[in-house]
Every structure is written in C-alpha cells, then in structure tokens.
C-alpha cells in the first residue's frame, strides 16, 4: 500500500495536507477544498475531477474498444484515467471528455500520449482535470471550419495542465464562457496556415475568456491571429454565479499572466474583449519572430458589434483592462511596456478602459529572459522530458 501511495504521489494524484494560496470571492466550500493537484492555480485550482472515484486503466492505443481512452471516458461515474501505454492514439472521430473525470496523462510511460486527427472536446463536460496530453489535430483525416485541436464553452470547473495543442484548422485551443477555469503550463502553437478553411488562410490561436478564468504560464507561438482573442461578454452567457454578479459583464473576469507570445505573424495577434468584462494582462513576455509585423503590439481593445457576435444589450461595450509588468523585446524600453503597446478602438481611450481587478492569487514571476527560457522548456506535455521539441 505504501508503495502504491508513493507512486500516486509521484503522479500528483493525491493532495498534500498543506495550506494553499490566498482566496478571494470564494464560496465556503471552495475555501475548505484542497487544490486539484500540487501546483494547481487560478480559478480552476479547486476542481475535483475524478477524485474519490474509480481508477480506469488505458491498456492500448486503439481508437475505441475495451482498454482504449474512448472506452475509458465512456465509463459511468467519477473516475481517474491512467495509462499503461504510451504513443499515438489515431482518433477516428471527435473525442468527448466526460464529466467528473481526471485524465492523468503523466502516468503514461515513455514520452506520453498524443491524440491525432480529431478534436478533444469539452462541450459536454463539467468538473474535469486533464494533464500531460498532446493534441495534434491536422487536416489529414477531416477538414471542417470548426476543427480546433481542443475547445469547450458553457461548462464549469475545468483545469488543463502541461498539455500541448497544435495543428488546427480553426483555432488551436478555444475556451470561453466557462465558469471556474484554468489553463496553465500549456503549449498553444502552430495553427495551420491554409488547411482548407472556407475563409482561406487562417492560423488562429484561440478565443479565451470566462466567468472567472485563468490563463497563466502558457506558451503561444507561430500563429497569425487570435494570440489570443479575448471573448468578452459578447454572447451574454448566463452560467455565472448570480449571488456574486448582477450580469454577465460583471461576471466576465479573465486573468492572463506569465504567458510567452512568440512570432504572432502579420495578423491581429492579441485583441478582443468586446461586450465588456474585466481582463488582467500581467507579466507576460512578447518576442516578435520572423513573421511578426507589429513587433511591439500587446493587445487591441475591441468593442461589441454585429460583426463579432455582440448581442443587443452590449453594442459598443469594451472590457476594462489591468495591464502591468509586461515585457516586449522589440520595444526601445521593453520592461513594463504596457499601455504603450495597446491599440485602441477609435471611440475609446486608455483612460476609459483602465482598471485594477483583484483575482485569486497565483504564483507570479517577473518576465525576464530567464523566464522565457524556462517557459519554453517547462510547458511540455511529457512528464519524462522538459524539452519543447519532445512535446510533439
């Protein structure tokens, strides 16, 4: 039993009895819960996933059938999925994540698990932990305009950790209008440039947002557009805690920090926030690459209108931003290059959208060259190696 417990602890599947980081606007239940796993941070840090349920083993790399990952996800009840094998799982259709589930990719031997050819979908799942999984969507088996490597919206209680997503037809990884969400230490890279989308050349990173959503310590690279695009409250999703907020604008709260953006191409890069809401952009690192046109861009403030899904209550609304501590390598004074790198819509000024937003405490690092290097090496989807190139 002690040997089993040691093994589980090495995978991060048990929770140490430690005091955790400070809380803000948390319910009594959240305040007394343990983190999802050691190192879980942000708004999704108290997700339980499969804790307390059965353990299901993935014993082969087949798309379906007994012992496959799809079979494991189809099992009823609360569950933690572990892997006895490693390698490529060649999907034959979209893979739906089930509720009350932990997918513990770090348990796979060798170089871990890679999902290929179809989307990892969170549209039917609440209370989910996914760690150390790679998704390589591509256009090899299927081309459609909604083909993300992974995505989910209108859900609650999700945390993604040390995953790697790439090769999408639409966005690489889109998560917005979710309640209590974290994406941390993930790679979001290499959206396909012209894979057959009906709009032509694409290469989009993702739409990010949520009603208490954290995106921290992620690496975004080699994409033309939506790096990321902040969703804002433009869809007026009502799945927020109505005891805390009066409307979806108040509830739209996004913390975006300690991320590294590289080579965001000649498209829009980072932009968004239409329909209102609150966005923190703190201690991020921007490094222009050979394909980058606007090399000192931090973000662009967008307003809600008919062209971006704005609903009638919110036309002309923009989010309020707290922008601080960002590092832009191409700027003449790169440190704290914050509002200097913000492009404003013509009807707004920085004074109109500046804000200070308290959010749950997470580990905060200064954006230095050493941070960029550590990010590129650490945000890997294989627990056996920290090299980004091995995350393919």
Tell where the protein language model's regions lie, with residue ranges:
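Boundary at the C-terminal end of the N-terminal hydrophobic targeting segment
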Residues: 28-33
């Amino acid at each position: 039993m002690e040997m089993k417990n040691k093994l589980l602890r090495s995978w991060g599947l048990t929770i140490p009895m430690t005091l955790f980081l400070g809380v803000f606007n948390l319910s009594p239940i959240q305040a007394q819960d343990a983190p999802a796993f050691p190192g879980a941070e942000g708004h999704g840090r108290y997700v339980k996933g499969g804790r307390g349920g059965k353990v299901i083993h993935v014993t082969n790399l087949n798309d379906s059938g007994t012992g496959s990952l799809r079979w494991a996800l189809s099992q009823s009840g609360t569950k933690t999925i572990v892997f006895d094998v490693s390698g490529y799982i060649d999907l034959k259709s979209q893979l739906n994540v089930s509720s009350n589930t932990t997918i513990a990719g770090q348990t796979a031997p060798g170089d871990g698990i890679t999902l290929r050819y179809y989307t990892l979908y969170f549209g039917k799942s609440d209370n989910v932990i996914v760690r150390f999984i790679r998704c390589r969507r591509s256009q090899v088996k299927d081309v459609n305009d909604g083909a993300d490597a992974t995505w989910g919206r209108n859900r609650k209680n999700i945390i993604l950790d040390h995953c790697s997503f790439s090769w999408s037809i639409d966005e690489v990884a889109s998560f917005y209008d979710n309640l209590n969400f974290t994406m941390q230490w993930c790679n979001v890279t290499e959206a396909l440039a012209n894979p057959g989308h009906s709009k032509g050349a694409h290469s989009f990173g993702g739409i990010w947002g949520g009603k208490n959503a954290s995106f921290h310590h992620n690496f975004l690279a080699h994409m033309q557009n939506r790096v990321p695009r902040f969703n804002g409250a433009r869809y007026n999703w009502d799945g927020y805690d109505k005891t805390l907020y009066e409307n979806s604008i108040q509830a739209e709260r996004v913390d975006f920090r300690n991320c590294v953006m590289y080579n965001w191409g000649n498209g829009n890069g980072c932009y968004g926030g239409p329909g209102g809401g609150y966005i923190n952009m703190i201690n991020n690192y921007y490094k222009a690459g050979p394909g980058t046109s606007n090399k000192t861009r931090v973000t662009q403030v967008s307003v809600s209108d008919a062209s971006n899904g704005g609903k009638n209550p919110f036309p002309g609304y923009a989010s309020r931003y707290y922008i601080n501590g960002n590092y832009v390598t191409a700027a003449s004074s790169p440190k704290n290059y914050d509002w200097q790198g913000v492009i404003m819509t013509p009807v707004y000024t920085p004074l109109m959208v500046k804000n200070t937003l308290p959010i749950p405490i997470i580990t905060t690092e200064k954006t230095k060259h050493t941070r960029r290097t550590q990010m590129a090496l650490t945000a890997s989807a294989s627990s056996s190696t920290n090299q980004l190139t091995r995350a393919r």
